[in-house]
């Protein structure tokens, strides 16, 4: 049985110390695509966290009964089933956001973070620790998405969650939105800057040279 200290480390470690995007550079494609608005970034964070946490839990419960030769197929079947459930829930209760996220919810099936944690962690770790690891990695993923989404929506459109924050020139205000921030390449540069900031703060994350 895991103690509170271990659970806390598993839950909080992926936020900065072992962030799946900033340190492991996983899940970057969806991060580029869904961060033009805070709403889509938040919903994608919740979707991935739910899938990652529960896939870890179910795979961990079954880990001693899964033949090694078919473990990847079993993992993907569990992940795909959860993604279908999440996608159907989004389409039922948040249809507009589901349309904006388009195929990226479905692509959680092949997200490196989800598959990586299932194979590297859940297959070797008890259920509770695996579940908390899934939540922690989802939060770490979301921390980057929401940081990038905050900058892109605020300075690219003058709003947050669709609510105007900076009064735009076109509406008689003072702020001229930077349309470049709404384009996917801007997310790439912002994520790069966040990685630089985190690795400056924690230099032990920098890869050894040579």
From Swiss-Prot:
Keywords: Cell inner membrane, Cell membrane, Ion transport, Membrane, NAD, Sodium, Sodium transport, Translocase, Transmembrane, Transmembrane helix, Transport, Ubiquinone. It is found in: Cell inner membrane. GO terms for molecular function: oxidoreductase activity, acting on NAD(P)H, quinone or similar compound as acceptor. The keyword Secreted does not apply. Its EC number is 7.2.1.1. This is Na(+)-translocating NADH-quinone reductase subunit D. Belongs to the NqrDE/RnfAE family. PANTHER family: ELECTRON TRANSPORT COMPLEX PROTEIN RNFE, NA(+)-TRANSLOCATING NADH-QUINONE REDUCTASE SUBUNIT D. NCBIfam families: nqrD, PRK09292.1, PRK12405.1. It is a multi-pass membrane protein. InterPro entries: NqrD, NqrDE/RnfAE. NQR complex catalyzes the reduction of ubiquinone-1 to ubiquinol by two successive reactions, coupled with the transport of Na(+) ions from the cytoplasm to the periplasm. NqrA to NqrE are probably involved in the second step, the conversion of ubisemiquinone to ubiquinol. One of its GO terms (biological process) is sodium ion transport. Composed of six subunits; NqrA, NqrB, NqrC, NqrD, NqrE and NqrF. It catalyses: a ubiquinone + n Na(+)(in) + NADH + H(+) = a ubiquinol + n Na(+)(out) + NAD(+). The chain crosses the membrane at residues 14-34, 42-62, 72-92, 103-123, 131-151, 178-198. GO terms for cellular component: plasma membrane. It comes from Shewanella halifaxensis (strain HAW-EB4). Coiled coil: none annotated.
């Amino acid at each position: 049985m895991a103690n509170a200290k271990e659970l806390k480390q598993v839950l909080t470690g992926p936020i900065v110390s072992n962030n799946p995007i900033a340190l492991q550079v996983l899940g970057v494609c969806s991060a580029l695509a869904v961060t033009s608005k805070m709403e889509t970034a938040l919903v994608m964070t919740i979707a991935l966290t739910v899938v990652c946490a529960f896939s870890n839990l179910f795979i961990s419960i079954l880990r001693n009964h899964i033949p090694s030769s078919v473990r990847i197929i079993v993992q993907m079947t569990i992940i795909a089933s959860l993604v279908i459930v999440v996608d159907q829930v989004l389409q039922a209760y948040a249809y507009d956001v589901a349309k904006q996220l388009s195929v990226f919810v479905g692509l959680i099936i092949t997200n490196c973070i989800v598959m990586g944690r299932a194979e590297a962690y859940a297959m070797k770790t008890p259920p509770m620790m695996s579940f908390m690891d899934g939540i922690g990695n989802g939060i770490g993923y979301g921390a980057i998405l929401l940081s990038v989404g905050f900058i892109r929506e605020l300075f690219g459109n003058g709003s947050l969650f669709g609510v105007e924050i900076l009064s735009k020139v076109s509406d008689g205000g003072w702020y001229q939105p930077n349309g470049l921030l709404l384009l996917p390449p801007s997310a790439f540069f912002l994520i790069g800057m966040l990685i630089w900031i985190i690795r400056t703060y924690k230099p032990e994350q920098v890869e050894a040279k040579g």
